[in-house]
Swiss-Prot record:
Transmembrane segments: none
Family: Belongs to the TsaE family.
Pfam families: TsaE
Coiled-coil region: none
Lineage: Bacteria, Pseudomonadati, Aquificota, Aquificia, Aquificales
Name this polypeptide is given: tRNA threonylcarbamoyladenosine biosynthesis protein TsaE
An MF annotation (GO) of this entry: metal ion binding
Keyword Transferase: no
Function: Required for the formation of a threonylcarbamoyl group on adenosine at position 37 (t(6)A37) in tRNAs that read codons beginning with adenine. Is involved in the transfer of the threonylcarbamoyl moiety of threonylcarbamoyl-AMP (TC-AMP) to the N6 group of A37, together with TsaD and TsaB. TsaE seems to play an indirect role in the t(6)A biosynthesis pathway, possibly in regulating the core enzymatic function of TsaD.
Binding site for ATP: E12, G39, A40, G41, K42, T43, T44
Protein keywords: ATP-binding, Cytoplasm, Magnesium, Metal-binding, Nucleotide-binding, tRNA processing
GO biological process, alphabetically ordered: tRNA threonylcarbamoyladenosine modification
Subcellular location: Cytoplasm
Organism of provenance: Aquifex aeolicus (strain VF5)
Residues noted as binding Mg(2+) in the record, renumbered to the chain: T43, E104
Length: 133
């Protein structure tokens, strides 16, 4: 994986701008892996990505911690949001190619086209490293 960019986010607006940048890179079948501790902003980023991809109701985007998988229609096909926190060995391979996958807590590099590592710097500040195949 190649480091594409490293940014500091200080607001939800910064998160949305980053999500817009990433949305422009997407063709519609990528796997985006989101890494970071609890509360780092993984779900917040997916909400911003949903908005950037023109999901009809981005405020309805919720963490799939208990459902494991949530799907949303976008201008580029489906956004499939998967959370591996409770079930790290969940096999989501059937979803690959069905849309853009945003996978929280994926620690393996193999399935990832893009990796976002989110580090908490303080209550409102995050460092994000973006890697790409």
């Amino acid at each position: 994986m190649e480091l594409l960019k490293e940014v500091i986010l200080e607001s939800e607006e910064d998160t949305y701008k980053l999500a817009e940048e990433i949305a422009q890179l997407l063709k519609g079948s990528e796997v985006i892996c989101l890494r970071g501790t609890l509360g780092a902003g993984k779900t917040t980023f997916v909400k911003a990505l949903a908005k950037a991809l023109k999901v009809k109701n981005p405020s309805a985007v919720r963490s799939p911690t208990f459902t494991l998988v949530n799907e949303y229609e976008t201008d580029k096909g489906k956004l499939i949001h998967i959370d591996l926190y409770r079930v790290p060995d969940f096999d989501y391979s059937e979803f690959i190619g069905e849309g853009i996958l945003a996978v929280e807590w994926e620690e393996r590099d193999k399935p990832c086209d893009i990796i976002l590592e989110i580090e908490i710097l303080d209550e409102n500040k995050r460092k994000v490293r973006i890697y790409r195949k």
